[in-house]
């Protein structure tokens, strides 16, 4: 049996951590000040019903998400849980093969692979598959 130290590390990396907020402008200012980040990008993702502030860190980023409509999943999250950590995203080079591999391990997904912002392919892993944590798999255009 191989030991943990002999296993090859995953090629996945943490892409971003997403936080649901009521006011993305106020939250972005607070995060900028607290973390010493000079620039913030703002983007609206119509398909998800959110306005996002993107704060770049050394090897990943934080995405602050505010709902833009009542049927947004983020609006539902804020109503039931309040502000806070929404999901963690893992980047992979081949989202299709990772989804196939994970399904073979019994991992459940919330929907199919779809287009996210800026040509990124995304899908979400059901929280019951990861001990209560909602996770996103993403694959960026090269």
Language-model features and meaning:
Residues 2-28, 83-92, 141-142:
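N-terminal beta-strand motif that seeds the catalytic metal site of vicinal oxygen chelate
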Residues 2-8, 53-56, 90, 96-142:
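Vicinal oxygen chelate
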Residues 8-10, 32, 42-44:
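Hydrophobic, well-ordered secondary-structure scaffolds
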Residues 11, 34-36, 82, 131:
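Alpha-helix termination/capping residues and helix-transition junctions
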Residues 27-32, 102:
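Conserved active-site tyrosine of GNAT-family acetyltransferases
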Residues 36-44, 106-113:
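Short secondary-structure junctions
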Residues 38-79, 118-141:
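Conserved short beta-strand elements that form part of the metal-binding/catalytic scaffold
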